[in-house]
């Protein structure tokens, strides 16, 4: 078993091991104690695949397991679904000594984490990621949120889990397009922090080295979270591709999934960085080539005006400036604070008409 310790306002471990789902109850009991009610939160598809096994594991360890299911899409990461989850917790009489277990991808983790942070002013929660994207990124770091009509993750807070349990075997049931979404976040980490990791992704597919990939990405995020838990400085580097990526997602009414949005966002910012002389043309070409190698999009049909309007609602805008993460070379990026009025020019340099 691989164990990565995260130091934050609440310290916790990320455990990575095939078959871990069936041992989840014992692992949770070791950290939180037993005899509690555990509310599993899962989208309908994931619930059908794994909620029964997780509930059985929890029951064996002495928990009372109940399950809240919802459709599971980005469209459902809303205040209405959040309210329904809170009502479910209250109906099952969960108290502050009980816990929530987020079983699924990033949407489920965001929703369940926000409910855990706010129900009765905070109850413990555990992340059990079942997508590559959640395993390498969103299950770690404590960001929780729901969406508003104006944009993604507009209502949320920082709330660290008590434990993260990652069973790579659950990734085997991912549809190919969902696996590709996770690969976008993996590539993000390589562009941000490690040229050798970037080369490893070129040489061998993620699927052939998935445990190593998860541990590597989580280790990188752990370091950034430890230095800047509340996203006021260096942790913002993790937003590489996200400002323009979120704009693409919003323009598509979330038909473009998060990973594909991030890939397009990385491609836009790489082209803009090369045009502005921040990185070389070769660095840009390498980023685009690796995204395409993994079947990820690097272009969008949305116009500059549409993306500008969407980007102006980004939660990363502060004091009229947008924080853009810009590559200097493979393994090194920097934070550029640009006036919101300059967004169209950056999009134009990124190839958006």
State each model region's role:
Residues 1-99:
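ATP/NTP phosphate-donor binding region
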Residues 15, 114-204:
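A glycine/threonine-rich phosphate-anchoring loop and its flanking beta-alpha core
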Residues 86-103, 112-127:
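Non-catalytic interfacial helical region
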Residues 107-114, 135-136, 247:
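Short glycine/serine/threonine-rich phosphate/pyrophosphate-binding segments
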Residues 151, 160-164, 169-176, 184-196, ...:
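Generic secondary-structure signature for well-ordered alpha-helical cores
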Residues 184-187, 279-353:
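C-terminal charged capping/lid subdomain of soluble metabolic enzymes
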Residues 199-306:
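Active-site segments that bind and position negatively charged phosphate/pyrophosphate groups
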């Amino acid at each position: 078993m691989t164990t990565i310790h995260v130091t934050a306002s609440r310290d916790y471990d990320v455990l990575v091991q095939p078959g871990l789902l069936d041992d989840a109850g014992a692992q949770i009991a070791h950290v939180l104690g037993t005899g509690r009610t555990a509310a599993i939160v899962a989208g309908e598809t994931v619930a059908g695949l794994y909620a029964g096994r997780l509930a059985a594991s929890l029951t064996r360890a002495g928990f009372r397991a109940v399950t809240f299911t919802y459709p599971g899409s980005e469209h459902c990461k809303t205040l209405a679904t959040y309210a329904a989850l809170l009502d479910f917790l209250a109906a099952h009489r969960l108290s502050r000594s009980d816990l929530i277990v987020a079983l699924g991808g990033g949407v489920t983790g965001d929703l369940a984490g926000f409910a855990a942070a706010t129900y009765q002013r905070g109850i413990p929660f555990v992340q059990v990621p079942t997508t590559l994207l959640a395993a390498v990124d969103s299950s770690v770091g404590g960001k929780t949120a729901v969406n508003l009509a104006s944009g993604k993750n507009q209502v949320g807070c920082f709330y660290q889990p008590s434990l993260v349990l990652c069973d790579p075997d659950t990734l085997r049931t991912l549809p190919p397009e969902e696996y590709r979404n996770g690969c976008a976040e993996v590539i993000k980490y390589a562009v941000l922090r490690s040229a050798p990791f970037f080369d490893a992704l070129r040489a061998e597919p993620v699927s052939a080295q998935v445990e190593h990939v998860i541990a590597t990405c989580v280790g990188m995020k752990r370091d950034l979270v430890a230095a800047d838990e509340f996203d006021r400085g260096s942790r913002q580097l993790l937003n590489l591709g996200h400002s323009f990526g979120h704009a693409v997602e919003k323009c598509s009414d979330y038909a473009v999934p998060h990973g594909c949005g991030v890939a397009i966002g990385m491609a836009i910012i790489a082209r803009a960085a090369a045009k502005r002389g921040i990185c070389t043309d070769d660095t840009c070409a390498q980023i685009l080539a690796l995204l395409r190698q993994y079947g990820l999009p690097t272009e969008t049909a949305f116009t500059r005006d549409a993306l500008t309007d969407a980007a102006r609602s980004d939660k990363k805008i502060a004091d009229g400036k947008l924080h853009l993460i810009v590559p200097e070379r493979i393994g090194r990026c920097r934070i550029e604070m640009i006036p919101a009025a300059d967004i169209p020019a950056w999009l134009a340099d990124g190839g958006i008409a």
